[in-house]
């Protein structure tokens, strides 16, 4: 089990902020979350003031990999809150996460907290995944019996994003979007999978709306949000969605333009002192040669997720618990 402890032995990313409050550098998040995020003495972020729900989950079984842990924890936490009748889960499936929210593993514990997606993305960090006693070199999850395609909740209008709006984005970015993603953005920008999509090879739960194009600055605007993610990605990559446990990004410059990558949060492989360039070279995980290939990898609402999550909740291995005091969210 030594692999599960590697993340605890090295200084976490952004360790220099230990014991300090980190404020959001952009105006939208700074206005919504003026109190920032406190980093504890060990360099782990304390997102508790922003938590809207919390779940305690049992210790993982022997031999679990980090992708298995992240996925099982997320769907079990959602199932526990769904079973508890929490209002945020009224409009999503039993194992999906409410839109605009993501699960955070609290460092050194088996507590999970539901926090706003844009808060979790403030900076690279170590927390409860990096400190978990699992195999951090073991990737992927168990194969599914059947791979059903993922479906998106498309708008009733003909397009989500107009050609004119896409051209405006490209003008702002300084390059043409990769073709497969460009077509997707026009058809389904701002849309989310119906229920949840799963990338089995990486255990990535895709249950949040993809970014879109907005007339005003917003954390779901493709151009604006990428300005907020410079601790995670170089400008060779364009983030297109928040997913459970990290970011989904496209390669937009250099080699393999259009390829799709997963940038995990709370990654035991991450180290303090690395540049953003070093992080993308060492930490990003491939999940499709282009955006069409990525979508084809996704399994739509695999029943295995609900089965596992139900067993966790029914067996008392995942249960909702009270949240701590909340920080006011403005705007």
Spans of features found by a protein language model:
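Nuclease and nuclease-like effector domains acting on nucleic acids or nucleotide cofactors
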Residues: 1-102, 106-147
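Structured loops at beta-to-helix junctions and adjacent beta-edge loops in soluble globular domains
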Residues: 58-60, 117, 241-243, 253, ...
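Short, well-ordered strand-loop elements centered on a beta-strand within folded domains, enriched
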Residues: 65-68, 113-114, 254-267
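Short, surface-exposed beta-strand/loop micro-motifs that present aromatic residues
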Residues: 104, 239, 247-253
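Short, solvent-exposed loop/turn segments at secondary-structure junctions
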Residues: 108-110, 120-122, 190, 244-248, ...
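Acidic, proline/glycine-rich low-complexity IDRs
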Residues: 135, 142, 291-331
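A surface-exposed partner-binding patch
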Residues: 143-247, 306, 319-331
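Compact, glycine/acidic-enriched structural inserts
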Residues: 261-297
């Amino acid at each position: 089990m030594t692999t599960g402890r590697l993340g605890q032995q090295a200084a976490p990313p952004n360790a220099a902020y230990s014991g300090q409050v980190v404020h959001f550098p952009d105006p939208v998040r700074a206005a919504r979350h003026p109190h920032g995020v406190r980093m504890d003495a060990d360099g782990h972020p304390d997102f508790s003031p922003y938590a809207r729900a919390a779940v305690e989950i049992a210790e993982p079984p022997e031999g679990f990999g980090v992708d298995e842990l992240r996925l099982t924890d997320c769907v079990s936490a959602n199932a526990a809150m769904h079973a508890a009748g929490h209002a945020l889960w009224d409009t999503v499936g039993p194992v999906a996460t409410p839109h605009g929210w993501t699960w955070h593993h609290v460092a050194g514990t088996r507590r999970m907290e539901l926090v706003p997606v844009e808060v979790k993305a403030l900076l690279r960090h170590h927390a409860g995944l990096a400190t978990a006693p699992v195999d951090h070199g073991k990737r992927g999850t168990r194969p599914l019996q059947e791979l059903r395609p993922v479906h998106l909740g498309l708008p009733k209008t003909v397009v989500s994003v107009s050609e004119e709006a896409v051209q405006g984005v490209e003008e702002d970015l300084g390059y043409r979007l990769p073709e497969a993603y460009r077509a997707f953005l026009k058809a389904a920008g701002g849309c989310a999978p119906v229920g949840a999509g799963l990338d089995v090879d990486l255990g990535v739960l895709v249950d949040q709306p993809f970014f879109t194009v907005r007339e005003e600055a917003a954390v779901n605007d493709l151009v604006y949000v990428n300005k907020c993610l410079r601790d995670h990605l170089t400008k060779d990559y364009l983030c297109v969605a928040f997913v459970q446990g990290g970011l989904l990004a496209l390669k937009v410059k250099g080699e393999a333009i259009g390829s799709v990558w997963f940038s995990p949060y709370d990654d035991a492989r991450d180290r303090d002192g690395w540049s953003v360039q070093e992080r993308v070279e060492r930490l990003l995980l491939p999940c499709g040669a282009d955006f069409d290939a990525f979508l084809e990898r996704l399994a739509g609402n695999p029943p295995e997720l609900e089965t596992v999550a139900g067993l966790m909740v029914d067996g008392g291995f995942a249960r909702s618990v009270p949240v701590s005091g909340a920080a006011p969210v403005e705007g």
